[in-house]
Amino acid sequence: MPLLNWSRHMVCLTAAGLITVPTVYATDTLTRDNGAVVGDNQNSQTAGAQGPVLLQDVQLLQKLQRFDRERIPERVVHARGTGVKGEFTASADISDLSKATVFKSGEKTPVFVRFSSVVHGNHSPETLRDPHGFATKFYTADGNWDLVGNNFPTFFIRDAIKFPDMVHAFKPDPRTNLDNDSRRFDFFSHVPEATRTLTLLYSNEGTPAGYRFMDGNGVHAYKLVNAKGEVHYVKFHWKSLQGIKNLDPKEVAQVQSKDYSHLTNDLVGAIKKGDFPKWDLYVQVLKPEELAKFDFDPLDATKIWPDVPEKKIGQMVLNKNVDNFFQETEQVAMAPANLVPGIEPSEDRLLQGRVFSYADTQMYRLGAIGLSLPVNQPKVAVNNGNQDGALNTGHTTSGVNYEPSRLEPRPADDKARYSELPLSGTTQQAKITREQNFKQAGDLFRSYSAKEKTDLVQRFGESLADTHTESKNIMLSVLYKEDRHYGTRVAEVAKGDLSKVKSLAASLKD
């Protein structure tokens, strides 16, 4: 018997109409995953009226199998999120800073934005106090660029080696699965650089009234590289055109009693009504030689850049809700590693770790082909030798899965090379030299109104109250070092030993 000509056989099958659903069934007829039409989806097959269910009931088995596998691993952080789509329009010529096409004046780039809470789980109330994620995927002409940030402009730590410990401290007690402030402050009493961001967290900025009403920040310093190879350090900031609105403690209680999803409901509802939220994108810019002029390290993620001018470079409008939450919001893979030529990571120690960690955790959640999912696919062609992986649905015809090759060249482009960084010295494991852990936190406290200070002091003090005595007094001494009124007032609420606090604060150096 001659071998079957598969290509010819497929054509014949197609022509005969044998691989499509027979026309005797309506196109909206219920089918199984193999395309076969279902005869009954309400009653299982049984052995008679009183007998057991039959193993041959493949519709029942498939429904249960698929149901048992609906969930993928929850994000370790940023689990609860809301995704929306929109467009970014560049408005300023910054070709002197970056060769990235996304910044070309007038360039319009589709975006996907995922807002989120950070610490709490996927089904937690959105009223819980938390930093809030503000991550934007730009589908640019140079490939996908992800600006993965938060509503706070600073972070709790400056070195990625502390990240797993910080998250563990924030998460519930592994013994009881209950929140435990004492564990958190046991950790943070060893991390004085955290207090500026802790101040933000316990202020009303930790409970925004809506995603539309909060700013976004890239948090880290990045490097922009122009066509000449010249490097500038920048920080990115989204400014809400809806204004900033937060909930005070009384409002939090009122909202939570009625709506566990107030952030999502507000955003989705506004877009559904045609009230499209907008944000302007700004950059702060420093030349490499300017990094040394500050009394703190500008590449420290726990710091803002005071007095460095901001330049508006574009505007984003969010105008479409997702079509399917799981396929888009849950499967979107945001990662600082997704960069394009003209945008590079700085030497920020936290960012360097996030470049690996975020891409790695997305691969763990979604598998090796996660970036091939529709929400993650770039708008430009992908051309490399990466192959296979579970659930690979691509159609690859090339026999060349390596590089270099004469059979099928995939040349690199020198214009996409990374910038060069002059280095000297030896390898080390040491703290940064310009920590300045206290000044910016004190400045932040003093910037708040009287009511904002009162709300902050009350929330921070209540959280500290049941903390182990030594950790409590250390935390209070840091607050006292930042601003004596701040430390004194929180100590009153937390019932700390003020004389001990003052003594500890006297030994601290900024």
UniProtKB/Swiss-Prot annotation:
Residues 386-412 are annotated as: Disordered. Keywords: Heme, Hydrogen peroxide, Iron, Metal-binding, Oxidoreductase, Periplasm, Peroxidase, Signal. One of its GO terms (cellular component) is cytoplasm. Its cofactor is heme. Pfam families: Catalase, Catalase-rel. Heme binds at Y358. InterPro entries: Catalase, Catalase_AS, Catalase_clade1/3, Catalase_core, Catalase_haem_BS, Catalase_immune_responsive, Catalase_sf. Residues 1-26 form the signal peptide. The keyword Transmembrane helix does not apply. Its EC number is 1.11.1.6. It is found in: Periplasm. It catalyses: 2 H2O2 = O2 + 2 H2O. GO terms for molecular function: catalase activity; heme binding; metal ion binding. It is an enzyme of class 1 (oxidoreductase). Transmembrane segments: none annotated. One of its GO terms (biological process) is response to hydrogen peroxide. The active site is at H78, N150. Disulfide bonds: none annotated. Its main location: periplasm. Residues 386-400 have a biased composition (Polar residues). Decomposes hydrogen peroxide into water and oxygen; serves to protect cells from the toxic effects of hydrogen peroxide. Belongs to the catalase family. This is Catalase.
